[in-house]
Every structure is written in C-alpha cells, then in structure tokens.
Regions:
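A structural signal for short, well-ordered beta-strand segments and their strand-loop junctions
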Residues: 34, 80-84, 137-142, 205-209
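Conserved catalytic core of nucleotide-sugar-dependent glycosyltransferases
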Residues: 90-189
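C-terminal catalytic/acceptor-binding lobe
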Residues: 4-5, 12, 16, 20, ...
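Short, solvent-exposed loop/turn segments at secondary-structure junctions
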Residues: 12-14, 62, 86-89, 144-147, ...
C-alpha cells in the first residue's frame, strides 16, 4: 500500500470510525488512518486535547504558537480527506451500511440535493481522483482550518451540492485545475478563511496578486445577489462573478479582518479597506450558466452598482 491516506471525522463517533476503517481496509489500497476533529470536546477539555485526539484541528489554524507544529503533522500524509458529518449548513446522514444521504441546505438553498456517489468509499475515491489529477493534497467539504506547506500542495475547499457539483465530476476537477494553474486556492469568503489563506502563504498585501477565489456560494447564494442590496458587502464568489460579467470594471476592497469584500470604498467609515485587483479572467463552468444568466437579468436596470 503506497498511498498514505488520512480521513478526518468531525466528531468522536467510534462506530462510524470502525465502519470506515473496515471499509478502507477492504479496498486494500490505502495505508489509512482515521482521526477526529471534535471541536466541542476541545472546547470543554482544552488542556487534554493532545492526549485524546491525534490532530489539533482548531489550534493549528487559530493560534499562531501551534501553527508550525500542526503544519509538520499534515506534511506527513499524501492525501487528506475531511468528512464533516455534522455542521450547520448541511446535514449528512450516515446509514448503517455506510451510505451517505445529503439533505437540503438549511436557509437559502431550497432545492433538495442528494449525493451522486452512494457510499463513503466512493466519496474518498472521488476525492483522491480529483487530488491526483489536480495535484491537490487536501479536500475539505467545509471550512479548511488546516495550516499547510504551499510547496507540498494546495488546500481546496467546498461544500457538497454547490454550483460546481460533486467532487468526482469533471466540472469540479476543471475548477481545481483552473485554480491551481492560476495560483488560486478555492476558499469560501466567510469567516476568516481568506485571512488564514493569506497568513499561511505569507501574503501581506494585495500587491502579491495571489488571491483566494471562491467558485462556491460562499456566504451568499445567487438569491441574495440583488441590486437592492447595493452590493455593499460581497462574498468572494460574488466578486468573482461580477468580475467575469464586467471584466476590469469593478472596484473591490477587502476589509482589514479579511472576511468581507466591498464593492466600493464606502464613505463615512473608518474601516481600513485593502484594494483587490483581479488579473485573471474567471471562466463560467458548466452548470453555472443559468445562474449567470439569471443574475444578468436582475442587473439590467442597476449597472451603476458595478461602477460601469
């Protein structure tokens, strides 16, 4: 077995871990390990974290003192796949036979989506296929709070059922290849993920021209990208979308905390905003055309928001 795989489960479900390990061993393909990322356990037992769990999932990204240590740990593994089976925006149900059923997004996404690969092993296989074809080390279906060595690979993030579709689709692989070929890593525009990306890559200003670009929904989906909100606050996905629609005509500013993009430098505010420059054209991926077209219809009467 020449493929060293690590799978990270989000909670300490021993039955699930046992089932997963049994399935992985049956493939006879991977020298695999299963770790837990139990944020709740960490919060309650901060001092005992290292005694109970092999990977310090949260500390490694949010506390600088532990960043280097965690980075060294991750560098030992060829493939990293995280399975966040219990987070707010998406509900996964693991059946006894290892099948995964994906329920609808809570809140904005009303369409019911189901996973196109039926079981856990297929998910992992699909993830590894994407990583192999795109030279990616880690796939995380939610927020990748992983420090990493950019010389060893790129962190790629998404959630199931986003506009790009499933992990093992050619569309997703196309997106990965595009992101990598342009020195982009695919991250959400919410929380502090962009800030984290800039930190681990040593990016201090927008002059570096290496930016986190989201091809997923980010914090806002298409239903929220409307003229009436004046585009005051944008997710990274929104910004990429607008740049594709109106190349070079948009002005974007990143908030100092790294988690909000503004469409213009607002007046009457003391907030420090960093200008963002897009120097790459962002393609429309298969499956996104209908969203672009719908957005274009919405924008016909309000192009002033785009500084045209």
């Amino acid at each position: 077995m020449d493929k060293h795989l690590i799978v990270v489960l989000s909670h300490r479900d021993f039955k699930k871990k046992s089932l997963l390990m049994e399935n992985l061993k049956s493939t006879e393909k991977y020298d695999a390990e299963v770790w837990y990322q139990d944020e709740g356990f960490y919060n309650r037992n901060k001092d005992k974290w290292h005694e109970s769990v092999h990977v310090n999932y949260q500390e490694g990204s949010t506390q600088g003192d532990n960043r280097e240590h965690s980075m060294k740990n991750w560098a030992n593994y060829k493939y990293i796949v995280t399975i966040d089976d219990d987070f707010k925006s998406l509900k996964k149900v693991f059946n006894e036979d290892g099948k995964i059923t994906l329920e609808k997004y809570s809140g904005k996404m009303v369409e019911r989506r189901k996973n196109s690969f039926n079981n856990l092993i297929e998910f992992i296989e699909g993830s590894i296929m994407a990583m192999e074809e795109s030279d990616i080390r880690l796939i995380a279906p939610q927020k990748p709070y992983f420090p990493y060595d950019p010389n060893k690979g790129i962190v790629v993030q998404s959630a199931y059922g986003t506009a790009l579709g499933v992990w093992n689709s050619s569309t997703a692989i196309t997106a990965f290849k595009y992101a990598l070929s342009n020195n982009y890593t695919r991250l959400h525009g919410d929380d502090n993920i962009l800030n984290e990306f800039m930190y681990v890559n040593g990016i201090t200003t927008a002059e570096d021209k290496r930016y986190a670009v989201s091809f997923g929904w980010g914090k806002d989906d298409v239903s929220s990208i409307r003229p009436q909100n004046t585009f005051d606050k944008l997710s990274l996905y929104d910004s990429v979308l607008l740049e594709h629609l109106f190349p070079g005509r948009n002005k974007y500013f990143l908030s100092k905390n790294g988690n909000t993009i503004h469409s213009h430098k607002r007046k009457n505010t003391d907030e420090e905003l960093i200008p963002i420059i897009f120097d790459k054209k962002v393609p429309v991926f298969p499956g996104l055309e209908k969203y672009y077209n719908a957005l274009m219809e919405d924008l016909k009467d309000d192009r002033r928001s785009f500084h045209i």
